[in-house]
């Protein structure tokens, strides 16, 4: 399934439900928001997005608590959840989706290349994906391996993973 098809599914389901989404991205640097915006009519569902590539911006823009960043770092489950919660609040969206991880070519602070966290915050709770184990309110949605490839490939796969999680969550 291509990212474009999945993005169309996400946007269509949000419009049909009268809901909106906002993104907070680190390793993908806005690629998720751009992919969603490629869908005609996306402005009815896409509120906006934050690119928080620098760790300090996760706190100042996305409202990730400083304690979370100090204790867990920028590449962590807790950070992804806080980013999703923060962007949902900052942008006034029904859904917040975040991406943080390591695109390479080198590991970062003990985290391997291809480690990606997708956070999601919605009307019914928060969830997170790490190495593909997705859950929302305790329901496991799917699984996958660490992402592999060069920086560009990992970033594209991260976007595809975030879109796939949104499709699964939106499908109920």
Predicted features by range, described:
Residues 1-172:
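Short alpha-helical segments enriched in small residues
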